[in-house]
From Swiss-Prot:
Entry EC no(s): 3.2.1.22
Catalytic activity: Hydrolysis of terminal, non-reducing alpha-D-galactose residues in alpha-D-galactosides, including galactose oligosaccharides, galactomannans and galactolipids
Cofactor(s) for this UniProt protein: Mn(2+); NAD(+)
High-level lineage: Bacteria, Pseudomonadati, Pseudomonadota, Alphaproteobacteria, Hyphomicrobiales
GO molecular function: alpha-galactosidase activity; metal ion binding; oxidoreductase activity, acting on the CH-OH group of donors, NAD or NADP as acceptor
Protein name (Swiss-Prot/TrEMBL): Alpha-galactosidase
Coiled-coil zones: none
Binding locations of NAD(+): 4-70
Subunit structure: Homodimer.
Top EC class of this enzyme: hydrolase
Organism: Rhizobium meliloti (strain 1021)
Domain of life of the organism encoding this protein: Bacteria
Length: 490
């Protein structure tokens, strides 16, 4: 097989880049390739390159690894471009959580919709379009753009509709949900089949089969409620399953902020979440986790570099889609997964222009979606509410229309359940001003927003949220990890 080039944008996301790298190299036909890493951080690039070089050296592979802060150079001649960028980093992300809290909006993640996710999209989309321009101009003709960056639907929408690049959005929510269902049903490998369909982070297990037998709502509810862990961690998802009749792929914390019912009253939030891990609903949970992960990696880098010398065959291939898509496209070995693409009738009762997440098959001919899926009415209604917000958000990001941006936030299900229009208008002004350096399309609107804030009349409060935890120190994390090892050892 002829060699080709894979470019990873945002390769400074060190743990994820390493995972993608080892996944791809687990396929023998994909080892004689070049990985071109690019990131704004020279420091992070140097760390990840040293780790990947160590893997190549230890396993005597023909793989080449290059690293540069010059994105266009990294994309030259690339056949596949993978994006895992976080525009604004943790600094901007902290504002996505902090400012909405002043107006009563308590988010667990804030990276998909809700106030935080919408502003995240405003930061990302101009950069995504820059990526697409480079791909069109310097990548291999017909190059495929694999987007892992959130907000998934908005970024993918912009790349397809405005970037004019062959794009697929990838997420692992479906796989994680399927693992839960397999566990509660006692299914072994190969015994569970399922169809998930919807939009990213609001995808639904519309058909679940165990050894060919269809598993219904009542059986799933009983199995989840009988599970000693999931019955506590997934209370909100189980409640939605009872009412909608199907299980959501997304985590308890994620799902809680896409719906208008479970996070709107501070005194009721604790009823639906679980604090055993951030992903089950903790206020600003993913921000805390991301901050701790960054700090932990910086401290533990020497150990991570040493571990990179392990034989490749001892590293388990993850369930991320990227390596399997590349394997299917390059070798013809068919892969079935769930992908984010423009709808165009794949799901019959969602808008044609929406970015949907649904089953598809990949081979040498490309990604071929399974068409004609109809969602249960409640699932479709929930998804359509989010699609409408996504559409307005994308259009606002493209045009720099701050009034349309405010309307998008106003129509968000959770924000709309909590805030008045006056509160939304002021909140968006505050967020745009705080993040101005990452929002070039709103440069013309910043001064007016500052003037409005100077005479603001809407009262706010400094609120940490209903279920906030402080960022742990390196010493605290190390102690907890050691304690966990001792517990596991019995």
């Amino acid at each position: 097989m002829a060699s080709f080039k894979i470019a990873i944008i945002g390769a400074g996301s060190i743990g994820f880049t390493k995972k993608l790298f080892t996944d791809i190299l687990s396929v023998p036909e994909l080892r004689d390739v070049e990985f071109a890493l690019t990131d704004l951080s020279e420091h992070n690039l140097a760390m990840i390159k040293s780790i990947l070089d160590r893997i190549v050296e230890a396993n005597e592979l023909p793989t080449r690894v290059t690293a540069t802060t010059d994105r266009r150079k990294a994309l030259e001649g690339a056949r596949y471009i993978i994006s895992c960028v976080r525009v604004g980093g943790l600094e901007a992300y902290a504002d996505d959580i902090r400012i909405p809290l002043k107006y009563g909006v308590d988010q667990c993640v804030g990276d998909t919709i809700c106030a935080g996710g919408i502003l995240y999209g405003q930061r990302n989309i101009p950069v995504i379009l820059d990526f697409c321009k480079d791909i069109r101009e310097v990548a291999e003709p017909g190059a495929k753009f694999l987007n892992y960056a959130n907000p998934m639907a908005m970024n993918t929408w912009a790349a397809i509709e405005y970037g004019k690049v062959d794009t697929v959005g990838l997420c692992h929510g479906v796989q994680h949900g399927a693992e839960q269902i397999a566990e509660i049903l006692g299914a072994r490998d190969g015994e569970l089949d399922y169809i998930c369909s919807g939009i990213n982070h609001q995808t639904w297990f519309v058909d679940v089969r165990l050894n060919g037998r269809k598993v219904g709502k009542d059986e799933l509810v009983a199995a989840f409620e009988a599970h000693p862990v999931f019955s506590k961690q997934e209370k909100l998802r189980i409640d939605v399953l009872k009412r909608f009749g199907v299980y959501s792929t997304e985590s308890n914390g994620h799902l809680s902020e896409y719906l208008p019912w479970y996070r709107k009253r501070p005194d009721e939030i604790s009823r639906w979440i679980d604090m055993s891990d951030w992903i089950h609903g903790e206020t600003g949970g993913y921000l805390r986790y991301s901050t701790e992960t960054r700090n932990w990696f910086e401290t533990e880098y020497p150990r991570f570099l040493e571990e990179a010398g392990r034989p490749l065959e001892t590293i388990r291939r993850s369930n991320e889609h990227a390596s399997r898509i590349l394997e299917a496209l390059e070798t013809g070995r068919v892969y079935r997964g769930h992908f984010n693409v423009k709808n165009n009738g794949v799901i019959t009762n969602l808008p044609a222009d929406a970015i949907i997440e649904s089953p598809g098959f990949v081979d040498r001919f490309g990604i071929n979606m399974v068409a004609g899926i109809t969602l249960p009415e409640a699932c479709a209604a929930t998804c359509i509410s989010s699609v409408n917000v996504q559409r307005m958000s994308v259009h606002a990001a493209i045009t720099g229309d701050i009034d349309l941006l405010k309307l998008a936030v106003l129509h968000d299900p959770l924000v709309g359940a909590i805030c008045t229009p006056e509160e939304v208008w002021q909140m968006v002004d505050e967020m745009v001003v705080a993040q101005a350096k990452w929002l070039p399309q709103y440069a013309h609107a910043i001064d007016a927003a500052k003037e409005r804030l100077a005479r603001a009349t809407v009262a706010t409060r400094e609120w940490k949220g209903a279920a906030r935890r402080e960022v742990r120190s390196i010493e605290e994390i190390r102690a907890e990890k050691e304690a966990a090892k001792l517990r596991a050892a019995g």
